[in-house]
Swiss-Prot record:
<keyword id="KW-0963">Cytoplasm</keyword>
<comment type="function">
    <text>Responsible for the release of ribosomes from messenger RNA at the termination of protein biosynthesis. May increase the efficiency of translation by recycling ribosomes from one round of translation to another.</text>
</comment>
<dbReference type="GO" id="GO:0005737">
    <property type="term" value="C:cytoplasm"/>
</dbReference>
<dbReference type="InterPro" id="IPR002661">
    <property type="entry name" value="Ribosome_recyc_fac"/>
</dbReference>
<feature type="region of interest" description="Disordered">
    <location>
        <begin position="131"/>
        <end position="154"/>
    </location>
</feature>
<comment type="similarity">
    <text>Belongs to the RRF family.</text>
</comment>
<dbReference type="InterPro" id="IPR036191">
    <property type="entry name" value="RRF_sf"/>
</dbReference>
<dbReference type="Pfam" id="PF01765">
    <property type="entry name" value="RRF"/>
</dbReference>
<dbReference type="InterPro" id="IPR023584">
    <property type="entry name" value="Ribosome_recyc_fac_dom"/>
</dbReference>
<dbReference type="GO" id="GO:0006415">
    <property type="term" value="P:translational termination"/>
</dbReference>
<dbReference type="GO" id="GO:0043023">
    <property type="term" value="F:ribosomal large subunit binding"/>
</dbReference>
<keyword id="KW-0648">Protein biosynthesis</keyword>
<protein>
    <recommendedName>
        <fullName>Ribosome-recycling factor</fullName>
    </recommendedName>
</protein>
Amino acid sequence: MAFDLTDAKSRMQGAQDALQRELTSIRTGRANPHILDRIEVEYYGAMTPLNQVASISVPEARVLLITPFDKTALEEIIRAINMSDLGLNPSSDGNIVRLMIPQMTEEGRKDLAKQVKAEAEKAKVSVRNVRRDAMDSVKKEKEMPEDDVRKAENDIQKLTDNNIKAIDDIASEKEKELLTI
């Protein structure tokens, strides 16, 4: 009887996906609409994601243009951006919000690279926890022959190693992007 790895695979993939989402919100030196993904605007009394109350475009390399679908949301959009931890200063002409992405300093790049490493480490810990859970469930299988247990443990370890390598690749790609001027 072979051990089913689908749950472990999907949970490890979930850790990778969470890392990808987390890294898209880290701003580099270029304008990227995804840095605004976590910003929510109070719109008619409810907290609503910014991309549902406005269109976000990138007209230039370091400029984000936010065009509200409803002009009454303009002030709330500005307030939400100011309250976020992005460190961006929105400017408005009454119809649109313009965000200038400042050139990053060397120190800022290094700090963000450290943040990338920390997020990658969280993802690795998550993958290792999935491995531990899978190993525990293999050991709890009473009717499983010892050879099958050993094979399942090896398969789980290979899956873990592959996911850790993928996480390292994702993190190093983001670090390279950050440290490139």
